[in-house]
């Protein structure tokens, strides 16, 4: 078994959530939240911000840590167990530009119910729901 760690962001601008569409050689297709692997010497917050910038072209600010998701997948002759640490983030505009080199072909900011139904993976839906509720609480308290 191989253990891996990634970090990502639930990025919100004016109540809408950033999602990315990945299409990899017709083997993997679907809407996801931006996330990626921690590089050597990098802390989790820096990883999350870097991945949002690289994958979506979005400059974001971390508001707070919202939780961890876990999943596993198979690679030739082994299984990867991955932990993903998620942060609630704010963006400064609706601008996004998907990173084609990583097979992202579309990106955009969507209303909660749209983003929730677009997302391919249930663990990302759970994180989205938790992060969005945190956002609503902050907004209600005039802290967003």
PLM regions: where:
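Unchanged
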Residues: 38-126
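Charged phosphate-binding loop/patch that engages nucleotide di/tri-phosphates or the phosphate backbone
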Residues: 117-144
């Amino acid at each position: 078994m191989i253990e891996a760690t990634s970090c990502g962001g639930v990025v919100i601008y004016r109540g809408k959530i950033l999602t990315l569409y990945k299409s990899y050689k017709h083997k993997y297709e679907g809407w996801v939240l931006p996330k990626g692997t921690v590089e050597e010497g990098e802390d989790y917050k820096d990883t999350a911000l870097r991945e949002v910038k690289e994958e979506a072209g979005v400059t974001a600010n971390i508001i707070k840590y919202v939780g961890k998701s876990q999943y596993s997948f198979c690679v030739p002759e082994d299984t990867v167990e991955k932990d993903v640490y998620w942060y609630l983030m704010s963006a400064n505009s609706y601008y996004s530009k998907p990173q084609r080199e990583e097979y992202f072909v579309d990106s955009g900011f969507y209303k909660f119910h749209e983003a929730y139904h677009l997302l391919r993976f249930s663990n990302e839906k759970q994180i989205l729901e938790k992060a969005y509720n945190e956002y609503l609480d902050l907004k209600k308290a005039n802290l967003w």
